[in-house]
UniProtKB/Swiss-Prot annotation:
Subcellular location: Cytoplasm
Role: Catalyzes the last two sequential reactions in the de novo biosynthetic pathway for UDP-N-acetylglucosamine (UDP-GlcNAc). The C-terminal domain catalyzes the transfer of acetyl group from acetyl coenzyme A to glucosamine-1-phosphate (GlcN-1-P) to produce N-acetylglucosamine-1-phosphate (GlcNAc-1-P), which is converted into UDP-GlcNAc by the transfer of uridine 5-monophosphate (from uridine 5-triphosphate), a reaction catalyzed by the N-terminal domain.
UniProt cross-references to InterPro entries, sorted A to Z: Bifunctional_GlmU, GlmU-like, GlmU_C_LbH, Hexapep, Hexapep_transf_CS, MobA-like_NTP_Trfase, Nucleotide-diphossugar_trans, Trimer_LpxA-like_sf
Protein's gene: glmU
Name of the top EC class for this enzyme: transferase
Lineage: Bacteria, Pseudomonadati, Pseudomonadota, Gammaproteobacteria, Pasteurellales
Keyword Acyltransferase belongs to the record: yes
NCBIfam families per the UniProt record, alphabetical: glmU (TIGR01173), PRK09451.1 (NF006986)
Protein name: Bifunctional protein GlmU
Assembly, per entry: Homotrimer.
Pathway: Nucleotide-sugar biosynthesis; UDP-N-acetyl-alpha-D-glucosamine biosynthesis; N-acetyl-alpha-D-glucosamine 1-phosphate from alpha-D-glucosamine 6-phosphate (route II): step 2/2; Nucleotide-sugar biosynthesis; UDP-N-acetyl-alpha-D-glucosamine biosynthesis; UDP-N-acetyl-alpha-D-glucosamine from N-acetyl-alpha-D-glucosamine 1-phosphate: step 1/1; Bacterial outer membrane biogenesis; LPS lipid A biosynthesis
Keyword tags: Acyltransferase, Cell shape, Cell wall biogenesis/degradation, Cytoplasm, Magnesium, Metal-binding, Multifunctional enzyme, Nucleotidyltransferase, Peptidoglycan synthesis, Repeat, Transferase
Cofactor annotation: Mg(2+)
Active site per database record: 361 (proton acceptor)
Amino acid sequence: MTQLSVVILAAGKGTRMYSDLPKVLHTVAGKPMVQHVIDTAKQIDAKQIHLIYGHGGELLQQRLSSEPVNWVLQAEQLGTGHAMQQAAPFFADDENILMLYGDAPLITKETLERLIAAKPANGIALLTVELENPNGYGRIIRENGSVVAIVEQKDANAEQLKICEVNTGVMVASGASFKKWLANLNNNNAQGEYYITDVIAMANQDGYKVQAVQASEFMEVEGANNRLQLAALERFYQKTQAEKLLLAGVRLIDPARFDIRGSLTHGKDVEIDVNVIIEGEVKLGNRVRICAGCVLKNCEIGDDVEIKPYSVIEDAVVGKAAQIGPFSRLRPGANLAEETHVGNFVEIKNAQIGKGSKVNHLTYVGDAEVGSNCNIGAGVITCNYDGANKFKTIIGNNVFVGSDSQLVAPVTIADGATIGAGATVTKDVAENELVISRVPQRHIQGWQRPTKKK
């Protein structure tokens, strides 16, 4: 099987984005456009990925530092052909070279596999698409059904402008062919640039076959040159993802008001209300219900969990039949056992909450272990930070912590203990002890409230 290398063009400035950020780093579904393209290139088993960079190259390399790409500088942006010329020295004669664009993030593995499979043994395969309004795109010129040239909009005559089949810019040919054609490119055109599309005419002159493969969906090959186009890509992507989830059995109350910016795996009878955002890798069990306005990121949710409105869960695990929210925040390291309750305005960070325990109101639990069947009252704080270091709070089983208590870590509260409301606990508490640390109540007779001065 012939090996494949991929060239991704990513040197453009993106002037119409009106941004200091390189165009290809603008995001779709929370991920840079160029990252989508790199990920797709990996899926088709590219031997090597050549990334053509220019504007904002330092930032681009920083953001993609973990990616196994060959960085190829295009110091001057003189057209798509010029960009490919920079990568040509790295091409092996006997490999296939696939050309992609860093600002066209939604092209699929399946489409690229069709294109590669269609490449003639001696020739080039080109991805095209039919448009109702082809304005702005290079037109596909055919003779007797075969592609003989691509004419850019600014160079097209009146008859050619009527053609609706357009070039997507995606093509595949052998390394040897590309090197030969790229060496013969010129910039004799209205833009004064080196067009990669000129290789189509060269292939015909050499007697090579040019095979066109049509993309099934225009948005799959659409690029983003401005924020309006970027928003259109985002909406198309989200619509596609929502449709996949609906067909897989997930109930989305309103598919148009659901965003996924990562991956979602799910069980049966999952229900997701409006304005929910999924980020990173999220796993949902059976019969999970997520109410309006929640954000879930890199978390695992067990069966029969209900997440009430406007809760945020990040890098956390929630056990079966738990109830979360409304307005709860589970931060990284939160691990809730089954049948736990976490209520409104509760924040849990790097803490384990045991089976059946309840933390229902206005509470912070950080760097802690809470046993089973505990009740943590409203306004309780685990004081885990002394300004320099963090310390752990350990709470046993069947512990009752009264409202407005402060647990100053490091501290351990043993099984069955009761902490009276308003206590400040600084020492360990033994099993079944009652701790009260409040100031004795005083009654002042005849006291009068201050009055305002006239």
